[in-house]
């Protein structure tokens, strides 16, 4: 099993509150379970330390897409590295997908064989970083058509999450899928016992059941007319054109 001791959730201007904080809270919940601070029974899993940080690319507060101001734990430096790098989505993802600092951070981690995960429109940032190749990914409906036009493999129907451990990639749909996907990541990378406890802490097991132990999440419904309208409205903001259509 891949050893994960550090997780960096990257906050940026106009990232989504749900996409960012939901993942951050679940990872920090897992850290508390791993440390033995939350133990509904005598755990078989040995205690361990998991350091989870909300990091930013620049100093100062992070202003999220609905105006929430948050303080990062650290400004990520050129030599900082995390075993798992997590890129959330949000209306600021389009600008982030053109930010050389963000793209360099993702590329540096993937080149170093670290795990890179993302949700919602943040998957577009991974695409612009050039790390997805032909691997199947999932994302929010609003950027799926644009990613397909750029040659990214977004299967239909979309899955709530797609975990690709061998490729060191884990992608997630929009905000609705973040809870289930993050708990599934915990179950996969830290074991079923830790995943089960987190799934009860965050009520995930009651919502989607045994799927949390799988690498693919539940299928999403397809609403072609609505998805076309939402993509037309949001895509210029979330995935600005670069001229790289395939």
Q: Which residues make up each language-model segment?
A:
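Active-site-adjacent pocket-lining segments in enzyme domains
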Residues: 2-16, 29-36, 48-55, 73-246
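Short N-terminal binding/cap micro-motifs at the start of the first secondary-structure element
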Residues: 15-20, 63
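Histidine-anchored nucleotide/phosphate-binding helix
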Residues: 21-30
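Generic recognition of short, well-ordered alpha-helical segments
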Residues: 21-22, 65, 97-101
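N-terminal beta-loop-helix "entrance" segment that forms/cooperates
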Residues: 36-70
């Amino acid at each position: 099993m891949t050893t994960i001791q550090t997780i960096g959730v990257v906050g940026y201007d106009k990232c989504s509150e749900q996409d960012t904080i939901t993942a951050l809270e679940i990872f920090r919940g897992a850290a508390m379970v791993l440390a033995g601070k939350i133990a509904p029974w005598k755990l078989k899993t040995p205690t361990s330390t998991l350091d989870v940080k909300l990091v930013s690319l620049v100093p100062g507060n992070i202003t999220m897409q609905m105006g929430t101001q948050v303080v990062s734990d650290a400004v990520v430096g050129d030599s900082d590295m995390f075993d798992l790098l997590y890129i959330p989505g949000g209306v600021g993802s389009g600008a982030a997908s053109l930010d050389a600092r963000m793209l360099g951070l993702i590329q540096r981690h993937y080149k170093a064989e670290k795990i890179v995960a993302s949700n919602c429109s943040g998957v577009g940032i991974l695409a612009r970083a050039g790390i997805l190749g032909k691997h199947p990914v999932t994302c929010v409906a609003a950027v799926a058509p644009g990613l397909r036009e750029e040659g990214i493999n977004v299967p239909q129907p979309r899955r709530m999450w797609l975990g690709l451990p061998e490729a060191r990639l884990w992608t997630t749909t929009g905000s609705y899928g973040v809870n289930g996907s993050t708990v599934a990541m915990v179950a996969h990378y830290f074991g079923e016992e830790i995943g089960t406890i987190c799934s009860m802490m965050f009520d995930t097991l009651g919502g989607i059941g045994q799927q949390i132990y799988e690498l693919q999440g539940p299928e999403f419904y397809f609403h072609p007319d609505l998805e076309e309208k939402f993509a037309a409205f949001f895509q210029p903001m979330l995935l600005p054109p670069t001229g790289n259509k395939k």
